[in-house]
Amino acid sequence: MLKQIFNYERMKIIMANVYDKIVGDAHVVCSSSLLKGTEVGHILSVKCHKDLDNGSIITRGAWVEAQVFDSADYAAGKKPYLVLTTPIGYNSDRKYYQEEKYFYNAAGEIARAYELYVDDIFEVSDDAITALATAPVVGNYVEIENGLYKEAAAAPKSGIALKIIEKVNYTNGVSYRLHVESLGM
């Protein structure tokens, strides 16, 4: 009888190559540096009306059910909320699945949204901001565009006013701290 010899080392290399080539779309990473909502403000459960990155600015829509509201695109004059759901990965057998940049809130899912207040400070990864030039400039402002941020030299005339107050360098990327100067309501 012929015995089949199984080469575990070769199989391990083949499998590692397959899994190591998994690539996902990168998303915004957000941190609640100094949000009033983490202590005494409102934290809403919102049903995502579209795919939303953590760090997106939305407004509250209609009541859905048991403490859940619909989310809606932010518009000047509406109350702004910061989408920031704890990034829990259910498939954590590979390092790639554990990287926070691959986490997002899918359309139809329930996400966490923090009510924003004047003087709140939060942090978003650099890919959240569409820069005027090569990189966002500390001291400039951002406007909300499709839920994320577009750099502007001056504060917006209407809507929430967010100022870029600090660039933060990390080993794996760059983030910017944003200061809520006005809610624009």
State where each predicted segment sits.
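Surface-exposed, low-hydrophobicity beta-strand/loop segments enriched in small/polar/acidic residues
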Residues: L2, N7-M185
